[in-house]
């Protein structure tokens, strides 16, 4: 019985569960989607990490990219929509984590758009009734072209 309990503890602890960003990194973005999955971006200084998956489970996708490969879009101060985004590459696939405020209706939206070779594959939205943490505004990354 003791061996079974130890074996289960090792098995559970050996898999990285979805959690807050590691202590040496900062949360740039975090939300729960309409399908109860978590979108998370962490800034560790030299790297940016993106993860996606069910809360309290091993992420379905977790990538870490050198900071100089990640780009950002920052709102330029005019127009109806105040938009901010971070573009995280994984080969030819881009994960565009974004948030937007409609300045007329005050409707806030956030989520991730997944594209491959400039073709949009999926859009996943954060749940409107759940907390969104976004510190994309003002992040020091290369501007997107």
Q: Predicted segment positions?
A:
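Positively charged n-region of N-terminal signal peptides that target proteins for export
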Residues: 1-4
């Amino acid at each position: 019985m003791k061996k079974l309990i130890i074996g289960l503890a090792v098995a559970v602890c050996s898999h990285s569960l979805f959690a807050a960003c590691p202590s040496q990194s900062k949360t740039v973005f975090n939300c729960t989607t309409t399908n109860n999955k978590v979108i998370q971006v962490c800034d560790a200084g030299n790297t940016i990490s993106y993860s996606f998956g069910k809360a309290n489970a091993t992420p379905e996708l977790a990538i870490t990219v050198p900071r100089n490969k990640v780009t950002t879009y920052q709102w330029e101060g005019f127009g109806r929509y105040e938009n901010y985004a971070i573009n995280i590459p994984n080969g030819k696939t881009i994960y565009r984590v974004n948030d937007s405020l409609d300045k007329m209706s005050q409707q806030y939206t956030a989520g991730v758009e997944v594209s491959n070779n400039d073709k949009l594959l999926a859009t996943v939205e954060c749940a409107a009734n759940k907390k969104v943490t976004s510190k994309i505004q003002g992040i020091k990354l290369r501007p997107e072209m």
